[in-house]
């Protein structure tokens, strides 16, 4: 994968997350902001999830209250380089815990 393809795929991921949060109708307030390639999700309780791209490694990084995760693209899924879990699964787990209710990015 070259740098431009990586950026296109990361931008697509950011857009999907932003669209899901815009459409989300849960009880708690969740805000999403993109600034300089960093996507920040802020929850009503003040906690945050930070998602950024690491261009030199062609990775997406996810920082949550539970820890930090690095993802490589395998096929059409971003996969954690340690646990083998998908980006969406880990993001949903963290967002659900931090929001206090089920949050889905599917």
Curated annotation (Swiss-Prot):
One of its GO terms (biological process) is iron-sulfur cluster assembly. It comes from the Bacteria. InterPro entries: CyaY, Frataxin/CyaY, Frataxin/CyaY_sf, Frataxin_CS. Interacts with IscS. Certain pairs of proteins can bind simultaneously to IscS; IscS-IscU-CyaY complexes can be isolated in vitro, but (IscS-TusA-CyaY) complexes cannot. Belongs to the frataxin family. Keywords: Iron, Metal-binding. One of its GO terms (cellular component) is cytosol. The keyword Metal-binding applies. The gene is cyaY. GO terms for molecular function: ferric iron binding; ferrous iron binding. It comes from Escherichia coli O157:H7. Involved in iron-sulfur (Fe-S) cluster assembly. May act as a regulator of Fe-S biogenesis. This is Iron-sulfur cluster assembly protein CyaY.
């Amino acid at each position: 994968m070259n740098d431009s393809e990586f950026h296109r795929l990361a931008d697509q991921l950011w857009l999907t997350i932003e669209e899901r949060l815009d459409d989300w109708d849960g009880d708690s307030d969740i805000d999403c902001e993109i600034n300089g390639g960093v996507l920040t999700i802020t929850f009503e309780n003040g906690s945050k999830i930070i998602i950024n791209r690491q261009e030199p490694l062609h990775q997406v990084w996810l920082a949550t209250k539970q820890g930090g995760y690095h993802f490589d693209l395998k096929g059409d899924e971003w996969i954690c380089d340690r646990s083998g879990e998908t980006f969406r699964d880990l993001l949903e787990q963290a967002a659900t815990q931090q929001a206090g209710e089920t949050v889905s990015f599917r």
